[in-house]
Amino acid sequence: MWFGEFGGQYVPETLIEPLKELEKAYKRFKDDEEFNRQLNYYLKTWAGRPTPLYYAKRLTEKIGGAKIYLKREDLVHGGAHKTNNAIGQALLAKFMGKTRLIAETGAGQHGVATAMAGALLGMKVDIYMGAEDVERQKMNVFRMKLLGANVIPVNSGSRTLKDAINEALRDWVATFEYTHYLIGSVVGPHPYPTIVRDFQSVIGREAKAQILEAEGQLPDVIVACVGGGSNAMGIFYPFVNDKKVKLVGVEAGGKGLESGKHSASLNAGQVGVFHGMLSYFLQDEEGQIKPTHSIAPGLDYPGVGPEHAYLKKIQRAEYVTVTDEEALKAFHELSRTEGIIPALESAHAVAYAMKLAKEMSRDEIIIVNLSGRGDKDLDIVLKVSGNV
């Protein structure tokens, strides 16, 4: 329920029952043999796990410092780590006897992952999306519809992600007997941050075995980008007790912290309550949630998962920022040096790893969680960079 003082269940009375039911079901099925057999089967044959741990030799040589390894979550079916959690929760919902999935989505990635998992398991899928985002993300809307999902534009409020979340919650309260609300990151009220972390920690478990096989030792540093924080939590969690491994989360510095145009909740936010949890949020003096900015649509979230807030507080993980400009540079660098086009989100982690590697010795090791591929971002990069 709590990560130190962070997390909790700050929700209206009407949500207590569905959350209790979910917690009970998760406790029951998470170690269930048949549930895990099916989950592992789908992760392997449908999602393409395990993903490789790749030594970025040319990038390493170019920088001339620590060895850089990439955990290739960009190779998961669907193109990002989101699939790990979507299939996990969808299968859990199926085991609970639910027939319908709902989710909210901003940039559309989580909506697509939910639609994919729903199609795989034969479940009805409704996706809430701010009307403004529906306009901005036409391809992902089309993708969701192709996968059989129904996309519901939300016209209230700022017509963006936070309004979509409100609508999804309203729906869930009224329909939870047959509906599962599939949250896409390590955020929201308990038990969601724990459930999502557990389904994502397959990343870190694989990476640990793979680096031991490749190098015979654990890495010195693990670097991952942090929006809500699920890809980072997924790779961090299996290493939390390995105190020698430094964990670094990279937030979206946008146009710089002083500009106010960023999404760096842990670096520039305050502790508050939003989305059913106590964590760090970007808020003004009145406690209102501030608008966020990042070149990477998936980092554009005004808060962060409570377990990250806790890891920061106990100083087990360090959180830094990378600007739009630095991320773009890394996006081009990785594409040209290794033949891998990263998502702009992941490019934030690559940028910081490149900076860090320079200051480290050649026998040290960095693992970067390459959380997604960059196909979805080509439009953005084209607009910003003009011709390459």
Curated annotation (Swiss-Prot):
Catalytic activity, reaction form: (1S,2R)-1-C-(indol-3-yl)glycerol 3-phosphate + L-serine = D-glyceraldehyde 3-phosphate + L-tryptophan + H2O
Positions of post-translational N6-(pyridoxal phosphate)lysine modification: 82
GO annotation, cellular component aspect: cytoplasm
InterPro entries in alphabetical order: Trp_synth_b_CS, Trp_synth_beta, Trp_synth_beta/beta-like, TrpB-like_PALP, TrpB-like_PALP_sf
Signal peptide (from-to): none
EC number(s) on file: 4.2.1.20
Any one GO MF annotation of this record: tryptophan synthase activity
Pfam families, alphabetized: PALP
UniProt pathway: Amino-acid biosynthesis; L-tryptophan biosynthesis; L-tryptophan from chorismate: step 5/5
Cofactors (names): pyridoxal 5'-phosphate
Keyword set, alphabetical order: Amino-acid biosynthesis, Aromatic amino acid biosynthesis, Lyase, Pyridoxal phosphate, Tryptophan biosynthesis
Function: The beta subunit is responsible for the synthesis of L-tryptophan from indole and L-serine.
Subunit and interaction comment: Tetramer of two alpha and two beta chains.
Family per record: Belongs to the TrpB family.
Protein name, UniProt field: Tryptophan synthase beta chain 1
Species the sequence originates in: Pyrococcus furiosus (strain ATCC 43587 / DSM 3638 / JCM 8422 / Vc1)
Primary gene name: trpB1
